[in-house]
Amino acid sequence: MTLGLALSITMTAPTAITASAAPKEPRPWNNGKLIVSANHRFLQFENGQPFFWLGDTGWLLPERLNRDEADYYLKHCHEAGYNVVQIQVLNDVPTFNIYGEMSNPSGWDLSKADPDGTYSYWDHLDYIVDRAANYNIYIGMVAIWGSQVKSGHINADEAKAYGQFLANRYKDKPNIIWIMGGDIQGDIHPEVWDALANAIKAVDHNHLMTYHPRGRYTSARWWSKAPWIDFHMFQSGHRRYGQRMGNAVYPIPDNTEEDNWMYVDSTWAHKPIRPVLDGEPSYEDIPIGLHDPNEGRWKASDVRRYAYWSVFAGSCGHTYGHNSIMQMLKPGVATGYGTDGKEKPWYVAMNDSGYNEMKYLKALMLTMPYFARIPDQSIVIGNGTRYGRLAATRGDDYLMVYSYNSKTMRVDLRKISGKKKNFWWMDASTGALTFLGTDGNGVQDFSLDKVVTGSPGDGVLIAVDASKEYISKNQTTILTSKPWATPRDLNE
């Protein structure tokens, strides 16, 4: 996705505000720094507690929201279950924020970027990072958008200086994750990305780093052996099946545009294996394919499908996006995608279904033994194609099958331990659990007509060794599950 958006705002001075109180829960970084798991497929804290990345896309947060708005946005992200917000530090060179402050007042001489006595561009970014920490949210910090690198607005020497500036400013913040790239192929000025990434890593030894690629690419295509990359990211993008749009060079097979699960396998084909996630799937309420406002729009059920397909294929998390939120649309701000005058403001979009339904996926993944989970399509007999695909994953003593629109499935229960299994159906749109009963082993057929409601009626069949109690039989929602492991707080 390329962001080149019209901006019309009323400038206001920063005012004293009463920020919302911190949530009454432990700080995630009390578990130590984020690191890569021993099996190289997940993210975790130093004390062994799993970290399931659930990201929201807030690209233009630093540019378009004032202090009050930023606090409101981050508070609601936390309440909706998000633990990462992806932002652009620089969308342009220079970038202006809502207070009229610019990012590069003296070009790439960043010694003059933060003058005393001024609420500078960087002071406002500091505020956003600190408020995110207040809500236990990590900031996925895209240092500079790819279009600016492609246009030659920064060279390798400038990137090195910029990387040192960023690292020195944020290396001691607990809630930073560095993101190189920004909707760009890695072979476009790779010397700039190498210089920027290596400069940050030379100073900052506390935070993980990845790369956000162009649509239908994975960062592993260019950076699999880069010393600075800790985990991979792919952008499955915003196109429907068959929407090639005349591209002469196409990095995926025709008519596979929506199959975001395939990027996990293609990423892991590169060595060494690293964790991977979809950093930009189709956004809720954005025109299908982005650029034709007359197209239909991606719905809540679509964004759920992308999330479950990707995670059940082995992703270490998932990033959600919404057309209005990623642009931070509000009165006076023109949309870059859709029909101007008909788009909803970002703060209204936070009520949309898809935005509020991602937390059920996170809760489900943290309910089961985390690090033993693998994708395993052999669980299902005849797993279907396209929208009929049954996505399967399992641990040693549990298995899960996500169905987008299928009301029947044949499952091989011998793939997990236990002579008897307990079964549940989880509604992906509500997180509601229905206990289906206890049965034996072998290959079994499941008919879900009685528990599937609505259209498409997507959800997850859960089977657990009956000797385990990850979910109770009388449990009605996945949100009340107790995380399977609670390693000690390193500050205790």
Predicted regions and their residues:
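Bacterial N-terminal signal peptides
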Residues: 2-12
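Boundary at the C-terminal end of the N-terminal hydrophobic targeting segment
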Residues: 18-21
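Aromatic- and carboxylate-lined catalytic core of secreted/periplasmic carbohydrate-active enzymes
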Residues: 24-28, 49, 272-276, 283-286, ...
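Active-site mouth of glycoside hydrolases
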Residues: 25-243, 250-259
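Active-site flanking residues adjacent to catalytic metal/cofactor-binding acidic residues
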Residues: 178, 182, 279, 426
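Catalytic-core region of carbohydrate-active enzymes that cleave or remodel glycosidic bonds
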Residues: 205, 226-330
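Short strand-edge motifs at loop-to-beta-strand transitions and within beta-strands
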Residues: 444-446
